[in-house]
Amino acid sequence: EAGGNMLLDGQGAVIVSNVIFDGNQGFDPNLTQDQLEQYFLDYFGVHKVIVTPHLINDGTGHIDMFVKLINDTTVIVGEYENQSAGFSGNYDICNQVANQLANETNGAGRPFNIVRMPMPPYSNGVTYTYVNSLIVNNKVLVPIYGFSTEFANDDSVLALYETIMPGLEAVGFDCNQIIPANGAIHCIATKVPALPETIACGNLMGDVNLDGRVNIYDILKLVYFVTGVIEPELCAISSGDMTNDGDIKIGRASCRERV
């Protein structure tokens, strides 16, 4: 995952909606498909760009309002109960995109598996969505709204997430206050990966991040280790009152084998 209108499969493919070509939405109407593909290749190393239609009148046109990659081959696509359940045209758009992606492959050439997820009914200018969720470690945070119909049901959707994502717990969050602003959980979040990195063993001063310079980024690296934002590859950081002097501070680094 990367952004509202940019879903990466981790294998060199990205799914975006065609709102990116819409000058009325603030984008460059002169942008061509070839230029778009070159931008993704240059900046993200992506070699395959899949462009789908976007929902109508959802406030964003972003792909993450009705499509979600949960791994490199499994794609959730929203589904309305009938033509009248969504804003005019969106029932057909969801089905069109589901069929399009079912005939696509990921960046490694493997076919996508499509899972349809109910879309709550469009109401009072609001496009409700269960698809705009966020995966965090062993949980998936799912927007819920209090729907309990046979088709769009909060509890059933949470169960569906846990079925298609074994080992993860689906946690519902009431998003009635934010969905009128045209987004839910995925729209308002950003992710910081916990990446293995190397620091200078036995030395908490100087060039801690081993980039050949001593600057503010060395301090930030230490803070990131202590707070758990990043995870050390070759060294471990301890924190707290390591010296029993009554003062809690950054402790020492100790070398260890990478696990």
Model-identified regions with their sequence ranges:
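Histidine/cysteine-enriched polar flanking segments
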Residues: E1-A200
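Cellulosome-associated attachment modules in secreted, modular CAZymes
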Residues: E197-R258
